[in-house]
């Protein structure tokens, strides 16, 4: 009986030192940012920490060790992180990382930081004292480790079930899906910084993953189908291409009603082509570079590759929401295609999946989509993308300063004709019944390159879907036009035109 009471007392004493024991209140942290000029922030100072009421706050520091020279990267406040609990000193324990990271609790605890890797040494054997141990000592030495271990396991299990881990994966049993391509993402500090865009299915954040910026597209749980569709497209063999958005990971965060679905991709600071054209006028060479790399990306997406770089068969994929908002720009203005939430794959012997007719952005819908007269075959969907490409090429031309003449403010296709928020009926009237297209300005046609590009645009948005050019042909055309205008002749060029209305156009090429 006395042994049972002793065990109970030990357990109670251990439980009394629960998770709140040793917690230090964190209100302010030392702040430092090595990239302060680029990010337009303060370089150093004190940061006041703010967070949710029931969450703990910490300080952190990150630095590099370049051959013994310490290079401080960042300091500041850190969100609720189990790895930082009850740490009064900022100590990094990883053996030899690229970037050292530590976190702690308590005001200004990150003022000093150190690296102390875990060392596994020989086991220390406790030698009992020479006198014969009493029954009490035997019970304490036997039961105390068991009690501590049991409480630690229970505590860890309770915290796993009742808190939303800030940097870990959360699994949903009914749809485990394929494993994420980058399992280390959940082990690295990922911090959301600012919202960059809001779209049909959620918002896009700029985030920091260690020293790199990434984009995090967050879907609410009710848009799970769109998240799954885009994840499946990204996981298709052969989707790694310089003109397709780089995929990093797909994750599920939170539990129950707080569940969020994340897609983590490369971040491009220049944003979308729409945003760039709103604020910038482009040169002839810049126009050619954006247009050629954009066509190259769509051509590769449309291509069926039997054996792609050892990854397997890459099927033809139709984008189905091609527009300037879904074309991102790298720092050198190389185009990158993004947003594959509505994309559909065409695999031999398999149905293409969800192929509802009227999907995408109304303004960029082809005539056959607006009419609801779609042939649900692969070629028909690829030609729909090509109509939209014609509109995006027109947007590029409208902001080019290649010739003398005014460069108008940026406008969306058909904005001049039917405004910024056209209805489906407005577009049916203009595009289908009147067969109108965005207008070419007279002074554009005085430039030999722009004049040829206008011919190519007309062949992209042709009312007859079967007469539209393929993306691969557009890529070749633009390369030839650029060489011609820049002084390199080519026998394969389409004829230079001086007017779109009174010229014999070259034979129109099918999109296949």
UniProtKB/Swiss-Prot annotation:
How would you describe this protein's topology in the membrane?
Single-pass type I membrane protein
Q: Which reaction does it catalyse?
A: L-threonyl-[receptor-protein] + ATP = O-phospho-L-threonyl-[receptor-protein] + ADP + H(+); L-seryl-[receptor-protein] + ATP = O-phospho-L-seryl-[receptor-protein] + ADP + H(+)
What residues make up the catalytic site? 321
- For this UniProt record, give its keywords in alphabetical order, as a comma-separated list: ATP-binding, Disulfide bond, Glycoprotein, Kinase, Magnesium, Manganese, Membrane, Metal-binding, Nucleotide-binding, Receptor, Serine/threonine-protein kinase, Signal, Transferase, Transmembrane, Transmembrane helix
Write out the similarity annotation.
Belongs to the protein kinase superfamily. TKL Ser/Thr protein kinase family. TGFB receptor subfamily.
Question: Which residue numbers delimit the Protein kinase domain?
Answer: 190-478
UniProt source species: Gallus gallus (Chicken)
So where does ATP get bound? Answer: 196-204, 217
- Entry-listed glycosylation sites: 42, 65
Location in the cell? Membrane
Which residues face the membrane's Extracellular side?
25-137
List the EC numbers from the record: 2.7.11.30
Which Gene Ontology cellular-component terms appear in the entry? activin receptor complex; basal part of cell; plasma membrane
Protein name listed in UniProt: Activin receptor type-2B
Molecular function (GO) terms listed? activin binding; activin receptor activity; ATP binding; metal ion binding
Q: Which residues lie on this side of the membrane: Cytoplasmic?
A: 159-512
Could you state one GO biological process linked to this protein?
activin receptor signaling pathway
**What is the required cofactor set for this protein?**
Mg(2+); Mn(2+)
How would you summarize where this protein is expressed among tissues? Not expressed in hen anterior pituitary during the ovulatory cycle but expressed in the ovarian follicle.
Q: What induces it?
A: By activin.
